[in-house]
Amino acid sequence: YDKNIATGTNVPHFFTSRRISGYQGYGFHVPTQDLHDAFDADDPRITYVFTQTGDRYKGDTEAQDNAESPSGYHDYKMTVPAVEKTGFDVWMISYNIRLIRYSDVLLMYAEVLNENGKPGLALPYLNDVRERARKTNPIDPRRDQQAYIPATTTNTLPDITETDQERLKEIIWKERRSELAMEG
């Protein structure tokens, strides 16, 4: 590792919340209570959007402390555990910045089909995203302590059957918010 060669990014340093274990961010990207409340309580994606006081990543010596977060949550997607920063300084962290995801393409296509009067054709694309989310492990393998584990059931994120164009538009927007939360 040579910090004089740009091999990483400093984005997590700016976006990560203040007082994250082993790392001080500027807190420019803090999830809100409104975003948290937009998720169904059993949605396993909650695990991969929010960190909460008491969460601890494997290899870290201290748990998350959300005392300085205005919402009480931190952004999971921008958190780089201390153990993954070995050999890096805060300005050159090895981190994958997601520019676009397949689920984003599926949701855009579902929205286009719905807006063009074909809500029935939009459903398979929307439900593909929900099916993948439904299969998400609610227990984060990167953490050895997890303060909140969604209680998933066989009824978690059921397929959408709504074909009313206006109602489906709202459903797609809500799905987009949950699926892509804290990205971009």
Question: Could you tell me what each predicted segment is?
Answer:
Residues 1-6, 41-184:
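Acidic/polar-rich alpha-helix caps and helix-coil junctions
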Residues 1-39:
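Polar, glycine-rich mid-to-C-terminal structural blocks
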